[in-house]
Amino acid sequence: MLDRIPDKEQMTALVGESLYEIWIKLCALIDENYDMDRLWNKGGKAWTYEYKYRRGGKTLCALYARENCVGFMIILGKDERLKFEKDRENYGEEVQRIYDETQTYHDGKWMMFEPTDTSLFDDFIRLLRIKRKPNRK
């Protein structure tokens, strides 16, 4: 847990104005579909901040921020990978490539995207739906 949650000015200074807009749009899209707990944390070695969407002790996804970069991570477990693989041709090339290049660990595939625009957002929502049905109408 962070002592102080970064404000708009701090986030804009960190990732830049255009990526901060992507961050805001991605958060809005997730919030539109899911009622989740949202937790700010330190981003570990590679990132400055982590912003995690969780409910009932399970993580849906996490957003990450560092200098001039925004990350979106989703972890697909075994059953979720099977669902993705059955439907993979309906995902864009970049999502398929990242899926294929991501190492599989004992607890799943930790897929990290670094969006610079909104072009992958439909695929992100489709991936999130594999993990959990939207709970907002």
Predicted regions and their residues:
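Charge-dense, helix-prone N-terminal extensions
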Residues: M1-K137
